[in-house]
């Protein structure tokens, strides 16, 4: 029996393949494993796109197969108060938030961890995220070395962008078994072990709200205000159904395809700016249009994994959206709550409300919310 046999791990079981294989791997490593299924959204409709019941059934089937106990918990009130209301406020303000990041911060690694601690007496929690972490020795910890969060081994699936708000204390209490694997290997293990989730497709859409039609869903909570789509010169070229449905750099869904610009320009149209005061969407032609480009950004609501604010200019890389290639940049601290970031090369579609996440090689340093582009 390994040294882990006295350690209890509570695995966040989502009903997906990643958490299923995480539970199996931890069992193989000798841990006492139990599952916890979170319900974080109360359906107020009978639409076909909510899969909570199916996900719970799949999670239960996997736990039965592995011979582990599955607990359930309802965090719907916490999700509404700490994630969804912020999400709506940001959309009202014309920004584009990332609720998955806030969900990880407030629900999966806060409410979940507290419940696992206080009710289930956990030593660790585990999630099916594609990230890795370091394990400092007792001597290193005594000398102040903190665990670091690293990118997942599978660069195509790396989810460190969504977890930058974790502190080193939370990282220390968390295990990420599939972060050491590539996705095809995870599916192969699930298949070999006869887990019902082996071929289940990956979930997309807003964290816990599922793959429902986004505009329809958002329209239930925020009244849409249609307005004009204009060129930077002020020519009206179409109508939008609400600024909240559009994000900077967006090409699809403008319904102005075929509209020619000045001089017969037939380049595709992109969202270049949102004029909140006039409720006007500014559309520009060509992805190299100056309105789409930024030299850098200002960010606030900073979170550093080691909880140490950056005090001097730092050369590193940044992602301003998920799955983006790393952008070389320099962080210039303004104060403990704000930073200025200058890109080595101009970037397109830097979007206020989204997160800027910083890296030194494999290490995720942390990040912040983009306030404005510069």
Curated annotation (Swiss-Prot):
Positions bearing the site annotation: Interaction with tRNA: 129, 354
Biological processes annotated in GO: tRNA wobble position uridine thiolation
Positions of disulphide bridges: 103-207
Root EC class: transferase
Catalytic reaction annotation: S-sulfanyl-L-cysteinyl-[protein] + uridine(34) in tRNA + AH2 + ATP = 2-thiouridine(34) in tRNA + L-cysteinyl-[protein] + A + AMP + diphosphate + H(+)
Stretches the record annotates as Interaction with tRNA: 157-159, 321-322
GO molecular function: ATP binding; tRNA binding; tRNA-uridine 2-sulfurtransferase activity
Entry keywords, A to Z: ATP-binding, Cytoplasm, Disulfide bond, Nucleotide-binding, RNA-binding, Transferase, tRNA processing, tRNA-binding
Active site: 103, 207
A GO-annotated cellular component: cytoplasm
EC number in record: 2.8.1.13
Main location per the UniProt record: cytoplasm
Compartment list: Cytoplasm
Region (Interaction with target base in tRNA): 98-100
Chain sites annotated for binding ATP: 12-19, 38, 128
UniProt record similarity statement: Belongs to the MnmA/TRMU family.
Function statement: Catalyzes the 2-thiolation of uridine at the wobble position (U34) of tRNA, leading to the formation of s(2)U34.
Name the record gives this protein: tRNA-specific 2-thiouridylase MnmA
Source organism (scientific name): Aliivibrio fischeri (strain MJ11)
């Amino acid at each position: 029996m390994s040294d882990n046999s006295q350690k209890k791990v509570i695995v966040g079981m989502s009903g997906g393949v990643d958490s299923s294989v995480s539970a199996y791997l931890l069992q193989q490593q000798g841990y006492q494993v139990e599952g916890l299924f979170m319900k974080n959204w109360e359906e107020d409709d009978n639409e076909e796109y909510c899969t909570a019941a199916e996900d719970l059934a799949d999670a239960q089937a996997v736990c039965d197969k592995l011979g582990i106990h599955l607990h359930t918990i309802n965090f719907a009130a916490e999700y509404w108060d700490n994630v969804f209301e912020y999400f709506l406020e940001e959309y009202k303000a014309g920004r584009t938030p990332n609720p998955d990041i806030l969900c990880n911060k407030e629900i999966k690694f806060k409410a979940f961890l507290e419940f696992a601690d206080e009710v289930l007496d956990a030593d660790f929690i585990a999630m099916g995220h594609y990230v890795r972490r370091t394990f400092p020795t007792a001597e290193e910890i005594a000398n102040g070395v903190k665990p670091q969060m690293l990118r997942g081994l599978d660069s195509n699936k790396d989810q460190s962008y969504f977890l930058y708000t974790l502190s080193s204390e939370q990282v220390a209490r968390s295990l990420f078994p599939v972060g050491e694997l590539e996705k095809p290997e995870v599916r192969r293990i699930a298949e070999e072990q006869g887990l019902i989730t082996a071929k289940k497709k990956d979930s997309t859409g807003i964290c816990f709200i599922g793959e429902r039609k986004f505009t329809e869903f958002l329209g239930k909570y925020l009244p849409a205000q249609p307005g004009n789509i204009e060129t930077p010169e002020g020519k009206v070229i179409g109508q939008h159904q609400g600024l909240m449905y559009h994000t900077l750099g967006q090409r699809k869904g403008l319904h102005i395809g075929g509209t020619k610009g000045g001089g017969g320009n037939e380049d595709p149209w992109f969202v270049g700016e949102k004029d909140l005061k006039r409720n006007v969407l500014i559309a520009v032609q060509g992805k190299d249009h100056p309105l789409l480009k930024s030299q850098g950004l200002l960010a606030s609501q900073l979170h550093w994994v080691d909880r140490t604010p950056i005090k001097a200019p730092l050369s590193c890389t940044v992602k301003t959206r998920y799955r983006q290639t790393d952008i070389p940049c320099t962080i210039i601290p303004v104060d403990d709550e704000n930073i200025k970031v200058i890109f080595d090369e101009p970037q397109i579609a830097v979007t206020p409300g989204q997160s800027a996440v910083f890296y030194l090689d494999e290490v995720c340093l942390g990040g912040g919310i983009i306030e404005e582009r510069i």
